[in-house]
Regions:
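N-terminal strand-loop-strand
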Residues: 113-155, 182-183, 206-208
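Active-site proximal loops enriched in glycine and acidic residues that flank catalytic Cys/His/Asp
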Residues: 145-146, 158, 187-192, 217, ...
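Nudix hydrolase/Nudix homology domain
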Residues: 1-93, 150-154, 196, 216-253
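Cys/His-rich short segments
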Residues: 83-136
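Active-site-adjacent beta-strand/loop module that shapes the phosphate/pyrophosphate-binding cleft
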Residues: 192-215
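The catalytic Nudix box helix
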Residues: 155-190, 204, 212
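Nucleotide phosphate-binding site architecture
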Residues: 142, 162, 232
């Protein structure tokens, strides 16, 4: 598996026939200048990065595709490897210098982490816990549009955990802050690592308890309860845990 990233885009090649996309083979990358990863995840042959404004005109078979879109091209096992590899590159690119003493970092003896040889500070990848919740009110699901969503995109509510909070506290706080309602019967549903930017998504289900929807307009464009036949839009990536929560609601109603 050969993975070349440019920020949050993935280098892919179009199949000879049809509209499917594949990862480039080694021969297609021989003449391409890229920066190799210090860390080499298992199962990855080539891992590297290029500039987002790189000139790919000498390589007509290659294209940069937004990572969210690219994840729709592959099965779940490959998606997990792609996410892991991209996050290891992100980790290296954002931890080039020690946060303790300011000296350049280098690869640890294990080959898996970065460390500072000057002050012996160990630097590990940042993982940001975030909740995501499917809230039902009878046979309807709460769906919302964040201000940064594309017009056709809707999803369930999500938000990052704050220092000192339990996950359950995060669920209640984020829901009330974003749409102004109270919920009950919060139950763990599942989890997924998601590289936007470095989130461990912890999914829950919950039931509406009280209140009327009042949007935090700094974050939300719209929100409402919808039956399975009224769902106004979907997340952009079908393998995301947000999509799977919506699919679970549809299957049960």
């Amino acid at each position: 598996m050969n993975l070349i990233f440019a920020a949050k885009s993935l280098l892919v090649t179009r199949a000879a026939t049809g509209d499917s996309w594949h990862l480039p083979d080694s021969s297609q990358l021989q003449a391409l200048s890229y920066q190799s990863s210090l860390i080499q995840p298992e199962g990855i042959n080539i891992l590297g990065s290029i500039s987002s404004d790189v000139d790919l005109s000498p390589f007509p078979e290659l294209s940069l595709v937004n990572l969210r879109q690219a994840l729709n091209f592959f099965g779940i096992e490959m998606v997990e490897k792609i996410i892991h590899a991209e996050q290891m590159l992100f980790y290296q690119n954002t931890h080039r210098y020690c946060g303790s003493c300011g000296q350049p970092t280098s690869l640890s003896a294990s080959g898996k982490w970065l460390h500072c040889s000057s002050c012996e500070h160990e630097i590990y990848p940042r993982i940001s816990p975030a909740m995501i919740v499917a809230i039902t009110r009878g046979d309807k699901l709460l769906m919302a549009q964040a201000n940064h969503f594309a017009p056709e995109m809707w999803s369930v509510l999500a938000g990052f955990c704050e220092v000192g909070e339990s996950l359950e506290q995060t669920v209640h706080r984020e829901v009330f802050e974003e749409v102004g309602i109270k919920i009950k019967n919060v139950q763990y549903w599942g989890s997924q690592y998601w590289p936007f930017p470095n989130s461990l998504m912890i999914a829950f289900t919950a039931e509406y308890d009280s209140g009327e929807i009042v949007l935090d307009t700094n974050e939300m464009r719209a929100a409402g309860f919808f039956s399975k036949d009224e769902i106004p839009g979907r997340p952009s990536t079908h393998l995301s845990i947000a999509s799977r929560l919506i699919d679970d609601f549809i299957a049960k109603h």
